[in-house]
Amino acid sequence: MGVDAFRIDTVKHVSRVMFNRHFIPAFKAAGGENFYMFGEVCTRVNEVWNHGVAPLSTPFYTWKERSEYSADDSVAVHEGYEYEKNMGPNNQPISDNHALTGAYGNDYHKPDYSQASGLNVIDFPMHWNFSNASQAYGMRGQDYNYNDATWNVVYVDSHDYGPNMDNRYPGDTNAWAENMTYMWTFRGIPCLYYGSEIRFKAGADADKGPSAPLEKTGRAYYGDNIEGTVTATDFGEYTNASGAVKATLENPLPQHLRDLNKIRRAIPALQKGQYSNTGCDGSMAFKRRYVDDEVDSFVLVTIGGDATFTNLPAGTYVDVITGDSKTIAEGGSIITSGCSGAGNARIYVNTSLKGCEIAGKIAKYSSFLK
């Protein structure tokens, strides 16, 4: 069957020297140069640099070594840790691989991966700040510390933790809708813990070990909620749902996810684009772009409120939430309207660019996208 990617546990407890020297080259040799790997660098602090110790921090593992160490692994581990600890957070490498450039923040550039370790990470600092989407969004100012933050895996809660807590995320349906809209449109790869789409075990202890039955924790068995039948007919489309899975699918958040998945799939810039806030006036407003030989995907996004976007590339912009269309000249502006309510968004795609055939409205199931 094969393997699409590796999720590597407890990365923080293994020296980066060992990853760069042994593990990553071996995995790449087996899986190919583009084989995706991401690791859990569990830091449990709100800041990017874990108590000011660079080699125990999340971004650190996305970089190659920058000094030579002993051929003896046991010695090299100590040398590497001491060298980088003494260098400190302020002397770590930085990158603009995540960022659109140019005078107006509209220009995509080829990422420079010459110093990338080949290991990506769960965005633990963002996870720890995910009390709400706005607070998580505030972490973007630290993205330059990662080799390329667009490869970060982003989640709200997991089998171990919720944001800044040992519980599954306790937020209500509106909070989850906003979180999902943010994760599916901003940089990074969204990851959803099982059951969060129906707020399964919301607020429960994530893990009590032998101190409590699993049923009382966030690791409880979820299978009862997906019993029944359903026929998948296309991506995000299904018929003939019955039993418990029918009730699960009819919840507002799964319907919200149907639309978000379709939207993300239709717009390459949302999947893997660089981003900028330049010329984006809104509480959570940004633009993203991705360019390769076949596509030039440029999109404007505002979440939970209206925004004004200025100094934009010329073209016809179509909002996949409402179907609204606006045509502007080079350097023109777009002002959104009607974007209020938790989880709501306006997502305008420049359909005049190469490979961006968006006919109109995509959203049709979510009660939040309107």
Q: Each predicted region: which residue ranges?
A:
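Short glycine-/polar-rich loops that comprise or flank the Walker A/P-loop
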Residues: 187-189
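Short acidic/polar inter-strand loop motif in beta-rich domains
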Residues: 355
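Active-site clefts of carbohydrate-active enzymes
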Residues: 149-170
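Active-site-proximal helices and loops of the catalytic beta/alpha 8
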Residues: 4-148, 152, 171-173, 179-185, ...
